[in-house]
Amino acid sequence: MAAPGARGASLSGLLPAQTSLEYALLDAVTQQEKDELVYQYLQKVDGWEQDLAVPEFPEGLEWLNTEEPLSIYKDLCGKVVVLDFFTYCCINCIHVLPDLHALERRFSDKDGLLIVGVHSAKFPNEKVLDNIKSAVLRYNITHPVVNDADASLWQELEVSCWPTLVILGPRGNLLFSLIGEGHRDKLFSYTSIALKYYKDRGQIRDGKIGIKLFKESLPPSPLLFPGKVAVDHATGRLVVADTGHHRILVIQKNGRIQSSIGGPNPGRKDGMFSESSFNSPQGVAIADNVIYVADTENHLIRKIDLEAEKVTTVAGVGIQGTDTEGGEEGDKQPISSPWDVALGTSGSEVQRNDILWIAMAGTHQIWALLLDSGTLPKKSDLKKGTCIRFAGSGNEENRNNAYPHKAGFAQPSGLALASEEPWSCLFVADSESSTVRTVSLRDGAVKHLVGGERDPMNLFAFGDVDGAGINAKLQHPLGVAWDEERQVLYVADSYNHKIKVVDPKTKGCTTLAGTGDASDASSSFAESAFNEPGGLCIGESGRLLYVADTNNHQIKVMDLEARTVSVLPVCKSDSAVVDGSFPREKQKTVPKVPKSAAHIGLPPVTVHPGQALQLRLKLQLPPGAKLTEGAPSCWFLEAEGNEWLLQEQTPSGDIENISNQPAISLQIPTHCLSLEAVVSVVVFLYYCSADSSACMMKGVVFRQPLQITSTQPACAAPVELAYAF
């Protein structure tokens, strides 16, 4: 065996053999044939260890989520290791994370697998450990992460792009590399077969790695990485994407939370406010008591009706799409990582919010969702609900063009609409090209405003320079806001930790607020400090600029007249529509029903829409027995296959006193999706025998069929749910 890393192995040494394998896999028919090919490949490359031993992690690197720095040839010896070379700004790297999370759920370090994130920064701001910490928290990364700020391992292995996954054997030997996103099946196949291969040879160790999650040290906060903010100009309310808490907040001007929708955990569910869920939402837009949300990691556009207190999906199918054309009805059209939204008009004579513009970061494009039938520049008539590409080829570029489909964006992340003449355009914060661009609402032409470089393939032209046009330099801007009164554009220059202002007439770009340090200070514009601000919006008739100061977990308020910065004191309101509860407590999950639980079928009951049916528990304990004090005796409602029946219901409750048992009220929805349904009441009781010599957990399931009629029958008598344990 060669000394660890002695030969300076690189991915190029794997390329011929892995390329041959992947061609052979294309010709294989059955899964067994494919598995055998991978197994044979491993037999081949396993003998090349002297040439393909990776270099050790350099000493002195900063680590996250571990108790101490890790060594490939000590701590990781005996493990199959997946190295994820990533940079936290990159949307493609973000797209890989769900695959890694799924792999971690399937195989743990006890099984012999460990994932290590190797953070190799693109932008200077991303080399700073505190900023990587924020990203680790924001994206719920729970595996070890090393800050390879100088890209030492990247260069040693000749990694060429983000993301790149490198799979190592238990002796630090290179096995596979996967470049880019979209390789989930190969990742699972290669990893599982490698684990089996080395387990058969007795080379896998099941020892645990010392994991210390950074997120466990995070103090509670009303906001967690707020991404975007919008103002309801009719009422002055703020809408905040509380991204890290996976929820949307409606906040009064004084900071009191009026409504909290979703959270605290990620999910993908439509319905009433109390049951709906989001996954790292970003962009928000509000008009006429309706909020549109870029539900980024669900790859959806959601609609929040504040009057009906209901959430629905209006675009996307819930999985990442690769379509770069679109044209399907919204909820049938796959989309990819929408990052911001803006309400606007299709250009009809009547100015109305009939289009939702979408910054589609995942496909590097600008899309449109038709909220009413209309037309887009260079498009024929489009029907209501159509979700379609407006500008951008789908290639990650900084390419301007008079033809919108030939232009190229690089992870567009912020939108602002200037519908008035002479502008009539969308301003776009194009984060990976470090530019602000414009898209004409008249003909779709894409033009440069500030930042970046002339070469459309150069995505590394970033900096922090005030100037005009291409002489101005930004670093990964994420947000823009149009000031109609002053006719200027505000820019969240995120990785420079500044708010800048652009005059579109002169293309002049100057710093408005922020010292440039990643810090937190509320003072004058010149002395204030931000930490990766991600979104901003104009309020109070142009007097205030609200800023989502993402890594400071705050909404900052910039007074454009007094030129001061303050913090909005976000706090819970006693009259909030939904308790936001910082974060909201987890809803109870239904415990597993004991095998001994009785299942009782009840005779059908006839009910009508809108009726309240009373279900009364009548449970009897054995003689002398009593409920176990402090144990969670409880009931739950279930309606498998008919979940619509439980909307707006109280889904569970406690049983605290056997002599005063709860009555469960089942409100039949006014709009029923079926004329027959079954609701189950699941009961769990914890009780002790008379002499307290034994305590037990028992269960019973009552199954109540419902026959729903449109004619109003006589009021149904309460249903008794009787059972003796």
Curated annotation (Swiss-Prot):
InterPro entries: 6-blade_b-propeller_TolB-like, NHL2_NHL_rpt_dom, NHL_repeat, Thioredoxin-like_fold, Thioredoxin-like_sf, Thioredoxin_domain. Disruption phenotype: Full embryonic lethality. No homozygous embryos are present at 2.5 dpc. Keywords: Cytoplasm, Repeat. The keyword Lipid metabolism does not apply. Residues 319-338 are annotated as: Disordered. NHL repeats lie at residues 212-254, 265-307, 335-369, 409-439, 461-505, 517-561. GO terms for cellular component: cytosol. Residues 48-196 form the Thioredoxin domain. It is found in: Cytoplasm, Cytosol. Ubiquitous. Monomer. PANTHER family: NHL REPEAT-CONTAINING PROTEIN 2 (PTHR46388:SF2). Required for normal embryonic development. This is NHL repeat-containing protein 2. It comes from Mus musculus (Mouse). The lineage of its organism: Eukaryota, Metazoa, Chordata, Craniata, Vertebrata.
